[in-house]
Swiss-Prot record:
Protein name: Zinc finger protein 586
ZnF (C2H2-type) ranges: 88-116, 122-144, 150-172, 178-200, 206-228, 234-256, 262-284, 290-312, 317-339, 345-367, 373-395
Compartments, as annotated in UniProt: Nucleus
Listed CDD domains: KRAB_A-box
Superkingdom assignment: Eukaryota
Length: 402
C-alpha cells in the first residue's frame, strides 16, 4: 500500500484518448487495405481499454460527464460508420454508444460503468490482479503464458499487444513525426516525446519514500524500489534464477539459448549484449575514452580504469584467511575458492570442475578441438594464448629468460 501511495502522491497530468490515438481522414481510411484496417481497430480498442482500466483520462476522477476524447472513438467498420454518430445514451452516466447492444448489455459486463464505479470483476488467476474489463485481463494474461499473437511482417518479431506491433512497424517505416523543439530529436510516438522532454526540464516528480531519491518516470521508481524490497519478479524457467528487471532476464536467457544477436561488422564476432559489442569495437577503433586523472593513462573499458586507479590510491581487497590482497574484488572471490575448495564451473562432457569460468572455457577446447590462436607466420594453431606466445618466440628469436 505504501508503494502504491508513493506512486500516486505526485500530481499527474491528465491523459486524453486523443493524446494516444491515431486518427485518419476519410480519404486516408479509403486507402487502407482490410488487414491494415483490422490492425487499426485492434490497436484503438486495446488503447481505449487500457486507458479506461487505468482510470487516467481527462475527467476520469470526478462525476461529471466524460470529455469528448474519452467517449468518442471512431472505429470504421463500414461506410455507415464514417459519421461517428452515437444515438444511444446511458441514462446513468450520459455516455453515448453507436450500438444499442452496448447500452443494454448485462450490468456486470457494462464496461464503462465498471470504470465509473470502480468495480473490477475480472481477476487474474495467477496473481489475483483485478481489472475493470475482460479484454484488459486477456492482454495481461498473455504476459504469463508468453503468448505473442502479433507478428511483424518486416522482421518476424512477435508481440503480446497489437499496439506494440504498430509501434514496431513505425520503426521500420522510420516515420518520426514528433520532434523535440529543444534538441531536434524526433520520435515515433507522442508519449516518447513527452518522456524525452523531462531530460530538458529536469523534472523528477516520483520520489522513493525509503531513501528520498527522485525519478522522472514511475517505471524508474518501481525498478529502484526493488533495491529496498529485494523483489525479483522475473524468473528464468531454465535455471530458476530471478531478476529485478525484465531486460536482465532477457539478456540472461541468451546464456541458455546461445543467442548472440550483436555482431561486429569488422570481424564478424558476435555478442550477447550490445554493451559487449561496443566495448569490442574499441579494439578496431583503438578508442580509449577512460583517462586517469592522475597520470593521463587511458583505457578502453571503465572497469580497467577503476582497477588502474588503485595503483595510485593503494586500495586492496584482503583475504581474511591468509592476508593476501588483490586490486580487484573479483580476484579475491576467485582466490577464496582456494580455501573453500569450491569449483562451481563443471564440464558437461566429462564432469571435471573448475574454480574459474575461464579455466572451464580453456578445458572445453580439449573436447571441441578448437584452436583459436593461429600463427600468421607458419599457420600453426593453439588452444591457449600462453602456448601461442611461447611459439612466436621461434620466429622472433626473443629469449626473455636468461
Amino acid at each position: 500500500m505504501a508503494a502504491a501511495a508513493a506512486l500516486r502522491a505526485p500530481a499527474q497530468s491528465s491523459v486524453t484518448f486523443e493524446d494516444v490515438a491515431v486518427n485518419f481522414s476519410l480519404e486516408e481510411w479509403s486507402l487502407l487495405n482490410e488487414a491494415q484496417r483490422c490492425l487499426y481497430r485492434d490497436v484503438m480498442l486495446e488503447t481505449l481499454t487500457l486507458i479506461s482500466s487505468l482510470g487516467c483520462w481527462h475527467g476520469g476522477e470526478d462525476e461529471a460527464a466524460p470529455s469528448k476524447q474519452s467517449t468518442c472513438i471512431h472505429i470504421y467498420k463500414d461506410q455507415g460508420g464514417h459519421s461517428g454518430e452515437r444515438p444511444y445514451e446511458c441514462g446513468e452516466y450520459r455516455k453515448l454508444f453507436k450500438n444499442k447492444s452496448c447500452l443494454t448489455e448485462p450490468r456486470r459486463d457494462h464496461k464503462h460503468r465498471n470504470v465509473r464505479t470502480g468495480e473490477r470483476p475480472y481477476e487474474c488467476s495467477k496473481y489475483g490482479k483485478l481489472f475493470h474489463q475482460k479484454p484488459t485481463l486477456h492482454i495481461h494474461e498473455r504476459f504469463h503464458t508468453g503468448q505473442k499473437t502479433y507478428e511483424c511482417s518486416e522482421c518476424g518479431k512477435s508481440f503480446h499487444q497489437s499496439s506494440s506491433l504498430l509501434q514496431r512497424q513505425t520503426l521500420h517505416t522510420r516515420e518520426r513525426p514528433y520532434e523535440c523543439i529543444e534538441c531536434g530529436k524526433a520520435f515515433a510516438e507522442k508519449s516518447s516525446l513527452i518522456n524525452h522532454r523531462k531530460v530538458h526540464s529536469g523534472a523528477k516528480r516520483y520520489e522513493c519514500n525509503e531513501c528520498g531519491k527522485s525519478f522522472a518516470y514511475t517505471s524508474s521508481l518501481i525498478k529502484h524500489r526493488r533495491i529496498h524490497t529485494g523483489e525479483r519478479p522475473y524468473e528464468c524457467s531454465e535455471c530458476g534464477r530471478s531478476f529485478a528487471e525484465n531486460s536482465s532476464l532477457i539478456k540472461h536467457l541468451r546464456v541458455h539459448t546461445g543467442e548472440r544477436p550483436y555482431e561486429c561488422v569488422e570481424c564478424g564476432k558476435s555478442f550477447r549484449r550490445s554493451s559487449s559489442l561496443l566495448q569490442h569495437q574499441r579494439v578496431h577503433t583503438r578508442e580509449r575514452p577512460y583517462e586517469c586523472s592522475e597520470c593521463g593513462k587511458s583505457f578502453s573499458l571503465r572497469s580497467n580504469l577503476i582497477h588502474h586507479q588503485r595503483v595510485h590510491t593503494g586500495e586492496r581487497h584482503e583475504c581474511g584467511q591468509c592476508g593476501k590482497s588483490f586490486s580487484r574484488k573479483s580476484s579475491l572471490i576467485i582466490h577464496l575458492r582456494v580455501h573453500t575448495g569450491e569449483r562451481p564451473y563443471e564440464c558437461s562432457d566429462c564432469g571435471k570442475s573448475f574454480a574459474e569460468n575461464s579455466s572451464l572455457i580453456k578445458h572445453l577446447r580439449v573436447h571441441t578441438g578448437e584452436r583459436p590462436y593461429e600463427c600468421i607466420d607458419c599457420g600453426k594453431s593453439f588452444r591457449h594464448s600462453s602456448s601461442f606466445r611461447r611459439h612466436q618466440r621461434v620466429h622472433t628469436g626473443m629469449r626473455p629468460y636468461k
